[in-house]
Amino acid sequence: MGFFGRVTRTFVLRDGVTGRHVGALFFVAFFSVPIAGFVGVVQPFTLTEILRIPFDQQGSLTGNLLVMHELVNLSLIGLYGAASDKLGRRPLLAAAFLIVALGFCLFPLVSGQVALVMFRLIVACGVAGITSMLTAVANDYPAEVSRARLIAAVF
């Protein structure tokens, strides 16, 4: 029996949810977590080597970018949650990945601080959707008895 058969033995799932659904959830989670952290990892290189921003100015710019990113996340997570009840989780999750992909495609075009802010705004909009939809789906799939176990495995 393959991977998906073992998943359903490990977790008690809600009616209509199969091991394939859980496998897809793990697949999405596997890519979501690095996507959310990618910007922070490459930012020092971007500021130093691409934009040539002096080291003494990088701290304030990084702080401003992080605050802006978090404000976008906080303002959009509730909207994504409300929209997911109307439109469904899968279309919004796909749209969020496309928004992040758009931001990453624009990343090589960053030529100054304004472009960097725009890049971060686009990525923040997508990351807000990914994190809120991933959390919602992770809560939708398991039965109550194994909810904590599945959420711990996903995150």
Tell me the role of every PLM-derived stretch.
Residues V12-E49:
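Pair of pore-lining "gating" transmembrane helices in MFS-fold secondary transporters
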Residues F30, V114-G129:
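Hydrophobic core of transmembrane alpha-helices in multi-pass small-molecule transporters
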Residues H69-G78:
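Residue-level signature of mid-helix packing/kink "hotspots" within the transmembrane helices
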Residues G88, L109-V114:
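Helix-breaking motifs and short loop linkers at transmembrane-helix boundaries and internal kinks
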Residues R90-L93:
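Primarily marks hydrophobic transmembrane alpha-helices of the MFS/SLC 12-helix fold
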Residues L98-S111:
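C-terminal ends and interior cores of transmembrane alpha-helices
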Residues G129-A143:
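Intracellular juxtamembrane helix-capping segments at the cytosolic ends
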